């Protein structure tokens, strides 16, 4: 008999820095997962992406075992890194805080392709451009 998924837990954790402290510990503790087992495995799997925020979807089964899938970093995090800023604009329509090039947007779109609901790189680029504009970034050629 196949294991039944009892709960899905979605978290965003810095790569290689998962600890049993909040928010990881309480979220997994409620689901009955071995927290240390998860943190060790997550840190080992994401050690090469240090400095990035990694979204993770943890499937908890009825016997309290788990599997997890790591996703690509959020577009906003990648855009901030490309533009070299700490945060986006509080008023994106009025105040522009940084600019990104089409080449940087294409690079981010290609990296995010597996997680985006887009059929082509051009469609993915327009999605990333929309995120950039909503953060107060200007897009230059």
From Swiss-Prot:
SUPFAM superfamilies linked to this entry: Ribosomal L11/L12e N-terminal domain (SSF54747), Ribosomal protein L11, C-terminal domain (SSF46906)
Stretches of the chain forming a coiled coil according to its record: none
One GO MF term attached to the UniProt entry: structural constituent of ribosome
One BP annotation, GO: translation
Record PTM text: One or more lysine residues are methylated.
Cellular component annotations (GO), alphabetically ordered: cytosolic large ribosomal subunit
Keywords linked to the UniProt accession: Methylation, Ribonucleoprotein, Ribosomal protein, RNA-binding, rRNA-binding
Superkingdom to which the source organism belongs: Bacteria
Keyword set includes Lipid metabolism: no
Subunit architecture: Part of the ribosomal stalk of the 50S ribosomal subunit. Interacts with L10 and the large rRNA to form the base of the stalk. L10 forms an elongated spine to which L12 dimers bind in a sequential fashion forming a multimeric L10(L12)X complex.
Protein's job: Forms part of the ribosomal stalk which helps the ribosome interact with GTP-bound translation factors.
Protein family: Belongs to the universal ribosomal protein uL11 family.
Name of protein: Large ribosomal subunit protein uL11
Organism whose genome encodes this protein: Lactococcus lactis subsp. lactis (strain IL1403)
């Amino acid at each position: 008999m196949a294991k039944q998924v009892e709960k899905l837990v979605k978290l965003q954790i810095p790569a290689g820095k998962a600890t049993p402290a909040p928010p990881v510990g309480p979220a997994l503790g409620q689901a009955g997962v071995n927290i240390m087992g998860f943190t060790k495995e997550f840190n080992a799997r994401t050690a090469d992406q240090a400095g990035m925020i990694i979204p993770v979807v943890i499937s908890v089964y009825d016997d309290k075992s788990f599997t997890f899938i790591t996703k690509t970093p959020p577009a906003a995090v990648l855009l901030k890194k490309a533009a070299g800023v700490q945060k986006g604009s509080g008023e994106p329509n009025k105040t522009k805080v940084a600019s990104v090039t089409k080449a940087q947007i294409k690079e981010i779109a290609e990296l995010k392709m597996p997680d985006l609901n887009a059929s082509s790189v051009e469609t993915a680029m327009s999605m990333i451009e929309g995120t950039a504009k909503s953060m107060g970034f200007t897009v230059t050629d």
